[in-house]
Amino acid sequence: METEYLQEMQKMPQSDRSLRSGKLIAVQGLVKCYGSVHAVGGVDFEVGPGRVLGLLGPNGAGKSTTLRMMLGLTKPTSGLATFDGVSYGDLPGHPMHHVGATLSSDTFAPRRTARQHLWAWAPVAGADKSRIDELLELVGLAKHARRPVGEFSLGMRQRLALATALLGDPGVLVLDEPANGLDPYGIFWLRRFLRQFADDGGTVVLSSHLLREVEQMVDDVVLINRGQVVWTAEMANLYGDGEWSVVLPADRHEAMTTLQSQGIKHQTFGRGLRVFALPGVVSSALRSVSPIPGQPLVLEGNLESLFLALTDQLGKELS
């Protein structure tokens, strides 16, 4: 099965359409309160055609609620989200011609086959049913088109959800946890597909708690925790300075003084430091420095490490 799946990934079509009509997505001050609980406390970001933005953070951070507000499924307490200046509900014609979305891989009728599922959704999307076989081929499910969805793995349901989002041939994709349940080959396929979708002019917003798995998928990062945006960045800028590490010292001043005495470049970052050297070099330099209780002192430079420096979340909450 694994060999067959790898062959499907290797022969994946390079693009569903040669050109996309992506839109500028603007999220401005989105807030959602349930009584005294602030599920989302003011999220702002913009992303345009040719870009993939990752809304990243632990489970329960407010990512799904933010996406639902963008799509008009949850009414915000305040704020708005627009696609080229138009809210989702006011998009002309079939909204799925403009924006394709996946919000859950658990909403399939289990006795329907994959083809029957897309057949049922085609009229909703205003889509030609001739696209169904094309999309099943695209997401690697052509050989499983007649299998009941109830027999699908989580990864297969994720791919069927993506095919559903693509029915209307949209220029924008809004994907909630699309990497969840995918094996390494599926992650590789998704990364290639989203990159090609964006390169063809599409716009992508995806959410994930799997920071390491999606790090190579995104151009722009919005880290969210407990309903609040804690950091935004472009990935190109993040890795433009070469190798780096994250340090979580109990005494940041002590760590900074030690690094400075050895000529190691560093900068403050959240409750820790971003150090421009490999972890082994940094660990050797900081042998006498104690870590924040319950945390390692030196971490490999990646998004998950930065998140830990910005918050008091433990690593197990991100995986």
Regions found by a protein language model. Give the residues of each.
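Structural motif detector for alpha-helix initiation sites
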Residues: 114, 235, 300-303
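ABC-family P-loop ATPase nucleotide-binding domain
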Residues: 1-31, 313-319
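ABC transporter nucleotide-binding domain
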Residues: 190-277
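Short, charged/small-residue-rich alpha-helical element at the C-terminal edge
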Residues: 243-319
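Residues that scaffold the ATP/ADP-binding catalytic core of kinase and kinase-like folds
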Residues: 91, 238, 306
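Intrinsically disordered, low-complexity regions enriched in polar/acidic and amide residues
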Residues: 1, 6-9, 13, 130, ...
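ABC transporter nucleotide-binding domains
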Residues: 22-25, 32-212, 216-225, 231
